[in-house]
Amino acid sequence: MFSQTEDGQNTLTHIWDYREKLPNTPYTISGHSRAAERTSFYVPELGILFDAGISTYHSPKIVLITHCHSDHCCMLPMVITNWKSSEPFRVIVPFSQKTMFNKYLNSSFQLFTENSHVSVTGCNIEGWEPNMEYNFGKNILIKTYKCDHSVGCLAYGIIEQRNKLKDEYRTFSGKDIALLRKDGVSITNEIYLKQFVYIGDTSIKIFENYPELFEYQAIIVECTYLRNCDEEFAPMHKHIHWKQLVQYIVKYPEVHFMLIHFSMRYKNEEVIDFFNEKRSQLGISNFSPWLN
């Protein structure tokens, strides 16, 4: 499962080769995340890259950047350089950081070319505000949430729009349904399924501010600190400690919590042992650490 060096830390060689099903959803996910090191995840079924702290050979349809800290965005110029489509490359960032991201990308491409007059082309930087919904493709909505971090930061909810047959037509045969459709009868209702939400750097306050987050099938969320002795650092740096998060994991057993962004002070083996112990103590299994 892991690509590791002898000391138990990961190399970057096979990060994108390993893929796992995101529980409770129809999607799979690959990527890597460690606090103050690098974070990036890719969902191939949607063509969405979340954050760009790692270069990738994938050609995503859209990149959703949570915030401007370098471990979440430093490899964005390389991601753009590797873009293989003729379609404009879409990069979403917090609205307050749009101008700075444009400057960063232009400066990067000027360094690549040793030409101070060039600017990045074929790339659309879009600044999104929190608490908004944006259409993506035919049946996906992306909803933004405001994280509580030291800089402007967005979480991204993935919502799937489906058509569900109205109750009064459930007993109808396929032939009768086809005839109704031909006659222009509206036989379905639109429903919206909250598939998963990707929460980058934040304090625990995001769950207090947005109770609707627990309506998602899966929550990808940072859990930077684990040890009791590290508890003070969570509010200090606006991150999350396990002791703050566990109450919600227990309260919402139908939601799967994928935990990311562990501090580099913890080796993989320590993280695995920690959560194995917690599973045994709590008697629940609706959470998993991501350590690829």
Model-predicted regions and their roles:
Residues 90, 115-135, 206-292:
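Binuclear metal-ion centers of metallo-dependent hydrolases, dominated by the metallo-beta-lactamase
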Residues 135-228:
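Active-site-proximal loop/helix segment associated with metal-binding centers of metalloenzymes
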Residues 52-96:
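Active-site metal-binding motif and surrounding structural segment of the metallo-beta-lactamase
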Residues 1-20, 25-39, 128-132, 142, ...:
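Extended recognition/assembly regions associated with phosphoester-bond processing machinery
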Residues 50-53, 66, 199-200, 221-223, ...:
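Active-site flanking residues adjacent to catalytic metal/cofactor-binding acidic residues
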Residues 2-61, 154-158, 164, 188-199, ...:
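Conserved beta-strand hairpin/beta-sheet module of binuclear metal-dependent hydrolase folds
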Residues 60-67, 123-125, 141-143, 280, ...:
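Active-site regions of enzymes building and remodeling cell-envelope glycoconjugates
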